[in-house]
Amino acid sequence: MARYLGPKAKLSRREGTDLFLKSARRSIADKSKFDSKPGQHGRTSGARTSDYGLQLREKQKVKRMYGVLEKQFRRYFEAAESRKGNTGANLLFLLESRLDNVVYRMGFGSTRAEARQLVSHKAITVNGQSVNIPSYLVKTGDLVAVREKSKKQGRIAEALQLATQVGMPAWVEVNTEKAEGLFKKAPDRDEFGADINESLIVELYSR
């Protein structure tokens, strides 16, 4: 399955919620009505969605939100299932621990896609070492930073300014002047803030 390269707002409308695929510079909420799906008949109400349909839709939504394809998403679920604790919460923690997501959460990229590009282009270091793997799992205590030669990029400064205005999550501590941040702790489930029902995903894979 190839990565989706079409309009990002269309994906958010399809899922009925903001997937945070667009920069805060032009919020999807200002341009799209999430209660209608894309297409000519998007506003028409259809038959009740089956339990399987709801579970599948939730999985698709989370995959698109984090930019993860099916095979890799399945591996995350299997890893979450093998850990102690709640499988759904474990799954979200693994997704949140991805380097591209941490870069996004720290405000170095205005979207996860932009953060993924920064990682792939070797603009990011972890504990002083260059890491260009977006799926790299950041650990508690890791220091994530923008490389010195990349700090001059205007998009990074703009993203940091926006993130500072919106506010950053409690599990990261960012020094905006140095463009570096500490991954302080594993986020609690109620700190994610996203409209996710991970239990539906667990039910889907448990079939």
Swiss-Prot record:
Q: Does the keyword RNA-binding apply?
A: yes
Q: Which UniProt keywords apply?
A: Ribonucleoprotein, Ribosomal protein, RNA-binding, rRNA-binding
GO BP terms: ribosomal small subunit biogenesis; translation
Q: Where is the S4 RNA-binding domain?
A: 97-157
Q: Report the Pfam families cross-referenced here.
A: Ribosomal_S4, S4
Q: Does the keyword RNA-binding apply?
A: yes
Q: Which domain of life is it from?
A: Bacteria
Would you name any one GO CC term?
small ribosomal subunit
Q: Specify where the region named Disordered lies, as residue ranges.
A: 30-51
Q: InterPro entries attached here?
A: Ribosomal_uS4, Ribosomal_uS4_bac-type, Ribosomal_uS4_CS, Ribosomal_uS4_N, S4_RNA-bd, S4_RNA-bd_sf
Which molecular-function annotations from GO does this UniProt entry contain? rRNA binding; structural constituent of ribosome
- Function of the molecule: One of the primary rRNA binding proteins, it binds directly to 16S rRNA where it nucleates assembly of the body of the 30S subunit. With S5 and S12 plays an important role in translational accuracy.
User: Family assignment?
Assistant: Belongs to the universal ribosomal protein uS4 family.
The subunit field of the Swiss-Prot or TrEMBL record says:
Part of the 30S ribosomal subunit. Contacts protein S5. The interaction surface between S4 and S5 is involved in control of translational fidelity.
PANTHER family given for it? Answer: 30S 40S RIBOSOMAL PROTEIN (PTHR11831), SMALL RIBOSOMAL SUBUNIT PROTEIN US4M (PTHR11831:SF4)
Q: What is this protein called?
A: Small ribosomal subunit protein uS4
Identify the coding gene: rpsD
